[in-house]
Amino acid sequence: MKLSLSPPPYADAPVVVLISGLGGSGSYWLPQLAVLEQEYQVVCYDQRGTGNNPDTLAEDYSITQMAAELHQALVAAGIEHYAVVGHALGALVGMQLALDHPASVTVLVCVNGWLRINAHTRRCFQVRERLLYSGGAQAWVEAQPLFLYPADWMAARAPRLEAEDALALAHFQGKNNLLRRLNALKRADFSHHADRIRCPVQIICASDDLLVPSACSSELHAALPDSQKMVMRYGGHACNVTDPETFNALLLNGLASLLHHREAAL
């Protein structure tokens, strides 16, 4: 699996791995790259079955497999220890990595994540699946911003959204891969295992997230032994895109604090 690695800003700089959500594209993190690369060696990637890592996914494809293939790629790149920043599905992959490779994951950041899929989130995906079956890739792509962004943010950026739709349609991961990745997301359940995650965790959520209720992050916070929760009042599901200034400040401060906390505990 292909990874994109930024140059380390200094010798032995900590590594931060960015894991996007269901869309799978590493470019989702573009608003974070410049600030993170000043302090960390940053790893981005298109998830298997998407972008520059094309593949046909098995019907039983799982979050566990997503975590395993990423860890294998990191080890192959010579990376043994890393912090993980995961958005939605990416947060699930991050938790699986923390469970399966506790000696490797130094810090975990969960952005608009959950322990197991919420009934409201499931309802949203049911609607989106119906759109996919009835209207194909174009209907899925055109509906996606409604679940990602606040209405006023979208209304002020109509040309940008049209360009994003065209790009997403041109690079659509395919119906079968998308549904198999979505099914992996829906099957994931960390409610009985989260207390085994021992690395420090930062939880970031947006109170106006239409897709994932912020209560899901409260449940994560209650279940994860060494966690702190930060709430953005505005930003929607893709709060790192819509309000990068606020998000980046929370992320940078959180990473620095948790990495220092971990080093002090060793």
From Swiss-Prot:
Induction: Up-regulated by the nitrogen regulatory protein C (NtrC also called GlnG) and repressed by RutR. InterPro entries: AB_hydrolase_1, AB_hydrolase_fold, AB_hydrolase_sf, Pyrimidine_utilisation_RutD. It catalyses: carbamate + 2 H(+) = NH4(+) + CO2. Gene3D superfamilies: alpha/beta hydrolase. It comes from the Bacteria. Its EC number is 3.5.1.-. It is an enzyme of class 3 (hydrolase). Keywords: Hydrolase. GO terms for molecular function: hydrolase activity, acting on carbon-nitrogen (but not peptide) bonds, in linear amides. One of its GO terms (biological process) is uracil catabolic process. Belongs to the AB hydrolase superfamily. Hydrolase RutD family. PANTHER family: MONOACYLGLYCEROL LIPASE (PTHR43798). Involved in pyrimidine catabolism. May facilitate the hydrolysis of carbamate, a reaction that can also occur spontaneously. This is Putative carbamate hydrolase RutD.
